[in-house]
A protein has these predicted regions:
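Non-catalytic beta-strand/loop surface segments
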Residues: 1-17, 40-75, 111-166, 190-233
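Active-site SXXK
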Residues: 23-37
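M16/insulysin-pitrilysin zinc metalloprotease superfamily fold
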Residues: 36-39, 70-103
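Helix N-cap motif at beta-to-alpha junctions
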Residues: 72-75, 173-178
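Short amphipathic alpha-helices in soluble, non-transmembrane regions
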Residues: 81-86, 182-188
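Non-catalytic accessory/assembly modules
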Residues: 91, 95-105, 109-112, 116-126, ...
Length: 233
């Protein structure tokens, strides 16, 4: 089999850290990370990785946003260059932002608004179970908040949360730790740290009684039930 590697670059920014009035912003920014940089225009990231026999993806979670790559080990250095390049700067154009707002809104239409049950087992359960806004709000975001996002907001979000001091990079596969550390230092070592905002207190008090929510879904043909328990973070 051909030697391969897997890479995961995770930033400590997810739904919980979104500012109020900017619901869905962490997910929107995940999309912006694929819109190119001054050095690698839009499409370069995918073209280099896929052209080298690799695949890539990204996802936004409650506590982090991650970007993953799996490729032949010969592509490790180009991939590290690409990741370091977009950690330094992105193409913050109004055109890219407007385009990705519509992409995210279409995801909401497809996965939530026009899909049987939507994501009730995620968004509606969280909104019922938790008291603090950071835990309870819909991470997909409202159309109103997404439409209100400006290029200045994107730049501020990037500077606040996408520095090397707020990231964790993991590499596995057919590469030695010494080789991996040396290559990472080569491409990321000169990127300066950035100040990050104070993390909010997201701790919740234990529930003292059952919480329930009942709702109708005109798109669903049969009933559905979701049950959740609060567990230690």
């Amino acid at each position: 089999s051909a030697p391969t590697f897997g890479l995961c670059l995770a930033f400590r920014i997810g739904f919980r850290l979104e500012p109020k009035g900017r619901t869905g912003f962490a997910h929107l920014f995940e999309h912006m990370m694929f819109q190119g940089t001054p050095n690698a225009p839009k499409g370069t990231y995918d073209r280099v990785i896929e052209g080298g026999g690799g695949v890539n993806n990204g996802s936004t979670r409650y506590d982090y946003t991650n970007y993953i790559v799996s490729a032949p080990v010969s592509a490790l250095e180009p991939v590290l260059w690409l990741e370091a390049d977009r950690m330094k700067a992105l193409d913050f154009s109004e055109k890219n932002l407007s385009n990705q707002k519509e992409v995210v809104k279409e995801e909401i239409r497809v996965n939530v608004k026009n899909k049987p049950y939507g994501l009730f087992f995620w968004t509606d359960v969280a909104g019922t179970a938790f008291d603090k806004w950071e835990n309870a709000h819909d991470g997909y975001g409202s159309f109103t908040d997404l439409d209100a996002a400006q290029v200045a907001d994107v730049k501020s979000f990037f500077e606040s949360y996408y520095g090397p001091n707020n990231a964790v990079l993991a590499i596995v596969g057919d590469v030695t730790p010494e080789e991996a550390f040396a290559k990472v230092e080569k491409y990321f070592g000169s990127i300066p740290a950035r100040p990050t905002p104070a993390k909010p207190d997201v701790a919740e008090k234990a529930n003292t009684k059952e919480r329930t929510l009942s709702q109708t879904d005109p798109l669903a043909n049969v009933p559905a039930v979701a049950v959740g328990w609060k567990l230690p973070a």
